[in-house]
C-alpha cells in the first residue's frame, strides 16, 4: 500500500503520523436634441453622493486617476473619436493583462485536474489505514473522521506544493480583473460627468459628441437600451458556456452560477441609467471576455500556452459547445 508523493514514498501505517484528537479543522449631447436625464448618483459631483464616504474615496483614488490618464493618453495618441478610444483601450488592457492571467488560470486548473486520480488513490489508501488504526486504538467515528480529514488535507497540500498548482493561484485573474473593471468604470464616470478632474468639462464636451450610431452622446444613457441589453446577453452567454462545460457541478458551484446569472440580468437596468461611455466599456470588456473564453478552449492555443492536456479536453470544443447549447436551449421540448 505505497503511494509515491514527490519522489518520497508514503510509508505504511505506523509512519503516517495520524493524529486522532484535538484536530483543528483548517478553513478550507448632440445640439438641438434633449439629452436624457441621468440619475443623481450618476451625474452629481462625487461629494454629493456620500460626503467623505467610500464612493468619494474610490472615485478620487489613485487607481481611478491612473485609469483616467490611460484613457486620455490613448485618445490623445491615436486621435480616434472617443468611442474608438474606449474600444481600443479595453481591447489593449484585456489583451495585455487579463488574457495572460486567464491562460495561467487554465494552466493551474489543468494541473489540478490531472492530480485528481492520484488524490483519489491516496484518499482510498488513507481511508483504509485510518480504519485499521481506529480498530487498533478504539477511536470513535468522530476521531477517525477528523484524523482522515486532517491527514488528507496535509497530503493534498503536499501534492499542490510538489506540482506548484495550488487552486488559489487560479483566482489571481479575479483579483486583477475585477478591480480593473471598477477603476475603468469610475474613470469613465468621472470623465463623462466632469467630476474630479482638472480637464473634466472639456473632456465631457468631447464625450458628448464622441459617440457613434444610435448613441452619439457618450455622456447620456442609451435610451434605446440596445447597449444595456447587449451587455446582459453577452454576460449570460459567458455564464452559460462555462456552465455547459461543467459536468456534475457541486451545490456551491450551482449557487454561484445562479448568482452570476442574476447579476447579468440585474446589470441591464443598471446599464440603462449610466452614461453610454461606461456601458460601451462594459460591452467591449464582456465581448473580449467571451472571445478569450472561446480562444482558451482551442487545442492549438492551449498548446501554445503550454497548458497541460487533461482528460476533459476536447479536439472539437466549439462543436461540443454548440451541441450542448442546442440540446439545452433549442432542441429541448
From Swiss-Prot:
Q: What is this protein called?
A: Cytochrome c oxidase assembly protein COX18, mitochondrial
Has UniProt tagged this entry with the keyword Ribosomal protein?
Answer: no
Q: Which CDD domains match?
A: 5TM_Oxa1-like
Look up the record and report any one GO term of the cellular component aspect: mitochondrion
- PANTHER family recorded for this chain? CYTOCHROME C OXIDASE ASSEMBLY PROTEIN COX18, MITOCHONDRIAL (PTHR12428:SF65), OXA1 (PTHR12428)
Summarizing the function annotation, the protein's role is: Mitochondrial membrane insertase required for the translocation of the C-terminus of cytochrome c oxidase subunit II (MT-CO2/COX2) across the mitochondrial inner membrane. Plays a role in MT-CO2/COX2 maturation following the COX20-mediated stabilization of newly synthesized MT-CO2/COX2 protein and before the action of the metallochaperones SCO1/2. Essential for the assembly and stability of the mitochondrial respiratory chain complex IV (also known as cytochrome c oxidase).
Per UniProt, subunit arrangement is: Found in a complex with TMEM177, COA6, MT-CO2/COX2, COX20, SCO1 and SCO2. Interacts transiently with MT-CO2/COX2 during its maturation. Interacts with COX20 in a MT-CO2/COX2-dependent manner.
**Mitochondrial matrix-side positions:** 189-223, 284-333
Q: Tell me any Pfam family this protein matches.
A: 60KD_IMP
- Superkingdom is Eukaryota
Q: Which residues does the entry place in the Mitochondrial intermembrane compartment? A: 245-262
Protein's cellular compartments? Mitochondrion inner membrane
Named from the GO MF annotations, one term is: membrane insertase activity
Looking at the UniProt entry, the stretches that span the membrane are: 168-188, 224-244, 263-283
Which family does the UniProt entry place this protein in? Belongs to the OXA1/ALB3/YidC family.
Q: Name one GO biological process term.
A: respiratory chain complex IV assembly
Membrane topology term reads:
Multi-pass membrane protein
Enumerate the UniProt keywords alphabetically: Membrane, Mitochondrion, Mitochondrion inner membrane, Transit peptide, Transmembrane, Transmembrane helix
Name the InterPro entries on file: YidC/ALB3/OXA1/COX18, YidC/Oxa/ALB_C
Amino acid at each position: 500500500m505505497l503511494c509515491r508523493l514527490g519522489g518520497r514514498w508514503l510509508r505504511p501505517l505506523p509512519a503516517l503520523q495520524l493524529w486522532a484528537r484535538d484536530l483543528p479543522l483548517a478553513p478550507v449631447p448632440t445640439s438641438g436634441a434633449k439629452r436624457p436625464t441621468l440619475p443623481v448618483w450618476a451625474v452629481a459631483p462625487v461629494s454629493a453622493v456620500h460626503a467623505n464616504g467610500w464612493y468619494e474615496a474610490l472615485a478620487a483614488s489613485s487607481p481611478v486617476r491612473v485609469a483616467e490618464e490611460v484613457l486620455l493618453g490613448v485618445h490623445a495618441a491615436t486621435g480616434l473619436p472617443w468611442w474608438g478610444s474606449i474600444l481600443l483601450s479595453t481591447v489593449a488592457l484585456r489583451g495585455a493583462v487579463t488574457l495572460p492571467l486567464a491562460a495561467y488560470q487554465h494552466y493551474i486548473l489543468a494541473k489540478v485536474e490531472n492530480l485528481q486520480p492520484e488524490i483519489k488513490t491516496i484518499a482510498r489508501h488513507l481511508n483504509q489505514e485510518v480504519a485499521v488504526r481506529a480498530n487498533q486504538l478504539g477511536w470513535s467515528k468522530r476521531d477517525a473522521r477528523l484524523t482522515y480529514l486532517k491527514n488528507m488535507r496535509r497530503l493534498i497540500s503536499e501534492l499542490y506544493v510538489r506540482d506548484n498548482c495550488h487552486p488559489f493561484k487560479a483566482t489571481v485573474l479575479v483579483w486583477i480583473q475585477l478591480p480593473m473593471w471598477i477603476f475603468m468604470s469610475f474613470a469613465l464616470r468621472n470623465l463623462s460627468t466632469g467630476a474630479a478632474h482638472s480637464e473634466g468639462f472639456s473632456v465631457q464636451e468631447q464625450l458628448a459628441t464622441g459617440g457613434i450610431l444610435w448613441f452619439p452622446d457618450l455622456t447620456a444613457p442609451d435610451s434605446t437600451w440596445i447597449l444595456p441589453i447587449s451587455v446582459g446577453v453577452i454576460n449570460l452567454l459567458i455564464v452559460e458556456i462555462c456552465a455547459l462545460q461543467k459536468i456534475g457541478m457541486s451545490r456551491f458551484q450551482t449557487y454561484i452560477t445562479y448568482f452570476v446569472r442574476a447579476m447579468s440580468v440585474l446589470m441591464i437596468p443598471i446599464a440603462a441609467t449610466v452614461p453610454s461611455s461606461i456601458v460601451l466599456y462594459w460591452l467591449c470588456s464582456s465581448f473580449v471576455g467571451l472571445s478569450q473564453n472561446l480562444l482558451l478552449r482551442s487545442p492549438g492555443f492551449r498548446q501554445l500556452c503550454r497548458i497541460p492536456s487533461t482528460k476533459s479536453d476536447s479536439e472539437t470544443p466549439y462543436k461540443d459547445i454548440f451541441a450542448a447549447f442546442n440540446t439545452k436551449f433549442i432542441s429541448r421540448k
